[in-house]
């Protein structure tokens, strides 16, 4: 394919091609880490480390999310309102791990975009849809947990499961609608680094020359997929923590042993939620800051410095890692899921669930998944945190 030459030595060449495509900027396309950049490209040792890291993320993430989904569908007691959202989150993570993460590895293997114009648009759509499903599901989960804390005695209607499935479906539809413009405008562009006199193709949402569009796009991504949902989640869980703390002050020390254990459990859960919020912010903040940096700094040429390359790799690994940690956070925090996980992983009979799980005190509805249509004293063992899709422990578990 013929390429136009730059008009001046310092001008970046950008030309739309017919056989390449763009990637979602929520996980910015890495156009600077190719081996073509010469001296600042990763060495053999670094490339091996990158390949191994990606392989671990893909294999561990697929295994964990697949088991989580299987446990949900095979275990009736796990089919609670919060676990529907968790399973939806697992589907979104699995979609990302099966498509976009393997494609991202090719940035370090090939000299340019390999998947054509259609592939670029499809992958951009999938990537942004998955990110939207994750972020918006976590936000809805935070609202669900807040409601459970404020109204622990409220009985869920018999059609709660159906309504929750509808909500999860709406999240997917909304995420796809938001991702649609990304797929429409994404394309493959040819870039030139005038300092090294090399050209390469990359999938991008907008041409580098469209400075204003990049700035608007990066700000919108930062607000819609990070600042706004994280702010909402932070408000909900600040209120949850405050409610849990105040409730512990109102229970006399002479209460029965069971109530005292419940108080300690609620304190541990409040602390765990704060940690999960920090983990969520940590995984996504570098990625968004990197895209903002690329959009608002000089773009007359691609930054191929070693520091920029290192930050890019780390930010992408952190973002993709968020899709594989949820099942293992759930394994760590939920004794019942741990038993089912082991049963599926090692093909053995799952251990008998803790009988106290079906008779948990009403106060623990704040962090327990209530069984729709059941008496108010009946509830499932699983409870969730919205940031990793993981369950919070039963009162006899330890955080």
From Swiss-Prot:
It is a multi-pass membrane protein. Glycans are attached at residues 10, 18, 29. Residues 1-41, 104-121, 185-220, 294-313 are extracellular. Keywords: Cell membrane, Disulfide bond, G-protein coupled receptor, Glycoprotein, Lipoprotein, Membrane, Palmitate, Receptor, Transducer, Transmembrane, Transmembrane helix. It is found in: Cell membrane. The chain crosses the membrane at residues 42-63, 83-103, 122-143, 164-184, 221-241, 273-293, 314-333. GO terms for molecular function: bombesin receptor activity. Disulfide bonds join 120-203. Residues 1-31 have a biased composition (Polar residues). One of its GO terms (cellular component) is plasma membrane. Residues 1-38 are annotated as: Disordered. InterPro entries: Bombesin_rcpt_3, Bombsn_rcpt-like, GPCR_Rhodpsn, GPCR_Rhodpsn_7TM. Pfam families: 7tm_1. Belongs to the G-protein coupled receptor 1 family. Role in sperm cell division, maturation, or function. This receptor mediates its action by association with G proteins that activate a phosphatidylinositol-calcium second messenger system. Interacts with C6orf89. This is Bombesin receptor subtype-3. The gene is BRS3.
């Amino acid at each position: 394919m013929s390429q136009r030459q730059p008009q001046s030595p310092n001008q970046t060449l950008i030309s739309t091609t017919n056989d390449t495509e763009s990637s979602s900027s929520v996980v910015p396309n890495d156009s600077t880490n190719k081996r073509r950049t010469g001296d600042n490209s990763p060495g053999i040792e670094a490339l091996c480390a990158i390949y191994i890291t990606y392989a671990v993320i893909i294999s561990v993430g697929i295994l964990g999310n697949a088991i989580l989904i299987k446990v949900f569908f095979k275990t009736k007691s796990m089919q609670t309102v919060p676990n529907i959202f968790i399973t939806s989150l697992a589907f979104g993570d699995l979609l990302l791990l099966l498509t976009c993460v393997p494609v991202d590895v090719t940035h370090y293997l090939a000299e340019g975009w390999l998947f054509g114009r259609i592939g670029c648009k499809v992958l951009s759509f999938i990537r942004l849809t998955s990110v939207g499903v994750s972020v918006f599901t976590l936000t809805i989960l935070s609202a669900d947990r807040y409601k459970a804390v404020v109204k622990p005695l409220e009985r869920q209607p018999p059609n709660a499961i159906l309504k929750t499935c509808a909500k999860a479906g709406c999240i997917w539809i909304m995420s796809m609608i938001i991702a649609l413009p990304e797929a429409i405008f994404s394309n493959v562009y040819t870039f030139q680094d005038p300092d090294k006199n090399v050209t390469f193709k990359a999938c991008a949402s907008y041409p580098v020359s469209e400075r204003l569009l990049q700035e608007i796009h990066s700000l919108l991504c930062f607000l819609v997929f990070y600042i706004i949902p994280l702010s909402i989640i932070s408000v909900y869980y600040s209120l949850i923590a405050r409610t849990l703390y105040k409730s512990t002050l109102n229970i006399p020390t002479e209460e029965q042993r069971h109530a005292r254990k419940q108080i300690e459990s609620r304190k541990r859960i409040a602390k765990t939620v704060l940690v999960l919020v920090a983990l969520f912010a940590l995984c996504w903040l570098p990625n968004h800051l990197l895209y903002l940096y690329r959009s608002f700094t000089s773009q007359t040429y691609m930054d191929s410095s070693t520091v920029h390359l290192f930050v890019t790799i780390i930010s992408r690994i952190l973002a993709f890692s968020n899709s594989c940690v949820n099942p293992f956070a759930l394994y760590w925090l939920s004794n019942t899921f741990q038993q089912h996980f082991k049963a599926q992983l090692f093909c053995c009979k799952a251990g008998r669930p803790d009988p106290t799980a079906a008779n948990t005190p009403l106060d623990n509805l704040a962090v327990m998944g209530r069984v729709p249509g059941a008496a108010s004293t009946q509830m499932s063992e699983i409870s969730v945190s919205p940031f990793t899709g993981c369950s919070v422990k039963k009162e006899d578990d330890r955080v």
